[in-house]
């Protein structure tokens, strides 16, 4: 039995990943940094290791190294941006010292996808569809605005979950808002605001070292929170061959090996699809792939261990809810009673939940509690809602 270690195991995706791995026959351990969290109560995690936060990177890597010295781990899989970046930066050292496999690309490749401006600059150079995007600094505000146009959004180069993203409609808006975002999140880009229909797409792919796609899933995201654009709380798995083809071409250009996740928006007026960002880690909605026949966690483990992996049989048509976040959507959305399918459709043959299930209900309850507590914190609420 292989031993799998999840980093950032407190996140919601750890529930889906642990469930998929455990049902496939692996032993699952997880580094958890938050007591009130999904992973803290997930029944599919065999061992919980209370770990420091990734913010102190040196301490975190020392802690990880000490753990690997005392325990056999075959594969490490990061669940979130911070741990994915740390693992990628230290991949060569960890694999050499501990004979462990790190399920993350080498850092030069990882950084091109993780960094918002670098990833879209690659799209610009290679002709992949994307919104006009430019690096933003206090010295180039007018130049960036002239290239991107208005309305636009200021987006931190390194962030997740819509944190730090604000809309601007004039140079005066940029001058007023940019310094605040820069102080909190660091370097930013200015990106043209896409007037979209309210629906966006999430494309998950796995590219092998031979350059073959051995797994893919497309989510049509219909409800998300924050309402201005954020994490999926209701989506459906669909077929969309052109999206898969575009994203696969981007991964080919990157010489990517491993799992990747794309966010794509459709322009309301033209119907054109544009890549918004690339996430080089497992998304919260990974369970949508699993219930549609694509077991990405197993694909990841088998591929990094050098085993042969066959293409998965993708069976779309499933609905996936993130109940804790969907509750927040219901509280804030003016469409709460008009939306179709109805928010009150809790059960059905093809309805699934990413934050828990009947056999593992506690993560859903814990997620609701921790989510409410986070939104009571003014700084977190402002980063998400701007209020």
Where are these regions (language model features)?
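Active-site nucleotide/adenylate-binding loops and adjacent lid/helix of ATP-dependent enzymes
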Residues: 110-197, 207-212, 241-245
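ATP-binding N-terminal substructure of ATP-dependent carboxylate-amine bond-forming enzymes
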Residues: 1-103, 367-384
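Short glycine-enriched loops at secondary-structure junctions
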Residues: 32-37, 81-83, 209-213, 219-221, ...
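A short glycine-rich, hydrophobically flanked beta-strand micro-motif that places a catalytic Asp/Glu
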Residues: 257-269
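ATP-dependent carboxylate/phosphate-activation module, predominantly the ATP-grasp catalytic core
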Residues: 172, 180-181, 192-255, 279-305
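Peripheral (often C-terminal) accessory segments that flank ATP-dependent C-N-forming ligase machineries
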Residues: 142-144, 302-387
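Residue-level detector of structured alpha->beta connecting loops
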Residues: 72, 99, 149, 185-186, ...
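Conserved protein kinase catalytic/activation segment
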Residues: 271-273
